Curated annotation (Swiss-Prot):
CDD domains: LumP. PANTHER family: RIBOFLAVIN SYNTHASE, RIBOFLAVIN SYNTHASE ALPHA CHAIN. Keywords: Luminescence, Repeat. This is Lumazine protein. Lumazine-binding repeats lie at residues 1-96, 97-189. The gene is luxL. The lineage of its organism: Bacteria, Pseudomonadati, Pseudomonadota, Gammaproteobacteria, Vibrionales.
């Protein structure tokens, strides 16, 4: 389990593609780099991945099954990704905890500003929307958010403008795709 609180933003430095697998090399901020080693399990844009290699400040992950079910298939060199290292045993997680099991990809429908908040309207795939209600939590690119409202297949989340600096949420625009982790039918992550 993860807290759903982004610890830093990495930048895609290299993508190697094979038939069924991609290896992503991500430049890590120093403060997070010091807490990872080979076999560390962590979230990259909300998706649980395992470190396979570290060279300098570049951390490598193999992406296989997640290529077709996440935004990894569209990432390019230079893109920013949210990073979170799994908390230690016994850490408090809070009610917005994430598993790293991405349920689908959603599309940003609209973004508006209100004082110090950004309101992001996200079009959720039909197979996921039926299990979502306002005031639930949802993971968007690894950031745990409360849902303010649900209207048809559109949800609205709010986040403070400072999160647009400390996460990759600031790069979102209408049409952007995001990884989504939702509650399942039994209301568990």
């Amino acid at each position: 389990m993860f807290k759903g609180i982004v610890q830093g933003v990495g930048i895609i430095k290299k993508i190697s593609k094979n038939d069924d697998t991609q290896r992503h090399g991500i430049t890590f901020p120093k403060d997070i780099l010091d807490s990872v080693e080979k076999d560390t399990v962590m979230l990259v844009n909300g998706c649980s991945v395992t470190v396979v290699r570290i060279t300098g400040d570049v951390v490598y992950f193999d992406i296989d099954q997640a290529i077709n079910t996440t935004t990894f298939r569209k990432l390019e060199v230079g893109n920013k990704v949210n990073l979170e290292v799994r908390p230690g045993f016994g850490s408090l997680l809070g009610k917005g905890a994430l598993t790293g099991n991405i349920k689908g990809v959603a599309t940003v429908d609209n973004i508006t500003e209100e004082e110090d908040l950004l309101k992001v309207y996200i079009k959720i795939p039909k197979d996921l929307i039926e299990n979502i209600s306002s005031e639930d939590h949802i993971g968007i690119n690894g950031v745990s958010n409360s849902i303010e409202e649900v209207s048809n297949d559109i949800i609205c989340i709010n986040y403070p403008k400072n999160l647009s600096i400390t996460t990759n949420l600031g790069t979102l625009e209408t049409g952007s795709e995001v990884n989504v982790e939702t509650l399942n039918v039994s209301n568990e992550w």
